[in-house]
């Protein structure tokens, strides 16, 4: 989806923002898991994080203007409706997947009204899930803790801007954006995507890592009820990484995009 168009639109900042708003895709879900055999700074940790990012408002509403020459204003929009929906999405998923902890990440110590409302909604939803431990963490501290002790995190619940930043930080823990999938989910529609950019400088050179796209397909197949196909593709990707003899250059291998893809196909 990121590759369709990268220039700004008249109303929205990007195609991504336009689709999320038009289709009501309020949940951005990004699972962050360590792949077998992949050498990273944290390869000795069995990292398995789930990030739930509100997808439709915050500073991404595109409401900014020049007040006077040299002074601009950008509006941060936080609503009870959107905050409650993303909190419910995170807790319902955590309940289904038997996750133990949800942490809401915020800056309510400074933005007392906007982030304060987000936390109020998170607390209300959390009260309906007594079996899941709920906590809150200021965003700057959360960034430090993710780098120092990433294994202490389970499910992260965030407004749009913090979620955008921290989801990329988390991807760096397990090998980068070429690894991690993404899903944009609403009540009636869903879009699945690799969250990295288009990288036009390497187009056609066989250098791109298709893992994030493949893992996004794993999420999509599970979402539409094709669980067997989802599991087969997931297992094929993991087996390819575990063998380590056909990986792309960004993760320490020598394989081309097509060679890696062929290896995954052989393991299906």
Question: Locations of the language-model features?
Answer:
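Glycine-rich phosphate/diphosphate-binding loop of Rossmann-like nucleotide-binding domains
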Residues: 68-140, 152
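Flexible glycine-/small-residue-enriched beta->alpha junction loops
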Residues: 12-81
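Short, small-residue-biased leader/transition segments that mark boundaries at the very start
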Residues: 2-9
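Short, acidic/small-residue loops that bind anionic groups at enzyme active sites
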Residues: 18-35, 128-135, 180-193, 203
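Glycine-rich phosphate/nucleotide-binding loop
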Residues: 146-232, 236-245
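Flexible, glycine/charged-enriched surface loops at secondary-structure junctions
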Residues: 97-106, 129-137, 226-234, 242-254
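Short beta-strand segments
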Residues: 8, 30-32, 50-54, 105, ...
